[in-house]
Amino acid sequence: MQHQMKKIRLLFAAFVATLLATSCTQYNFEDTGLANGKHEKSMWDYFGEDSYNWDSLRVMAKRADLIPLFQGNSAYGKDFTFFGPTNHTIRRYLKKNSLEKVSDIPINDCKTFILNGVLRKHMMLDDFKRGTKSTDVSTPIGKGGEMFTMASGRQLWIYSFQEPYNNVPGTGPVQIYLVSPTTTRTSHVGSCNIETQTGVVHALDYYFNLNDF
């Protein structure tokens, strides 16, 4: 009887451990309404099919003559990563700057805002090095991670970090963070690993501002 009870306890412990592991790793993104996954289409067409999140970005791309970028017909090819600002971010920028519509944003600004988010290599969530945020008030750059030069020439320190789950460190979802040495602001990816035929998209969360990079 004692042996049987011990076996039951072991089976229960294994079940709980499996359940916890599944709960921790099922999602690596916030619920921003963007589904991560693989899409058999160009990044440009993917944006076009989700007007709720991306139609403002498409207007910016047209103004900046960057449609070929998202179609895979530019110097960046079909193997790049894009940290994309959603409509919420762009609408907030318009309101803050007293602009009525996206086409009122200066062309050069549209180009800079987009290229600030373009990384010239294909990088999924697991490709970003683990890191920890800075605890030094004199610098926004923490430990680990990696410094990248974006297509605009702007530098960003990017790292991944596994969040706690039920107050247990290192057991929750893995998130991507981006830190600008220029603005000292930290940004966060809301939905990651959106793969298209012309690159991978990591959607920035709704709190991101276009000037954060």
Which residue stretches match the model-derived regions?
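Mature, structured domains of secreted/extracytosolic soluble proteins
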Residues: 8, 24-213
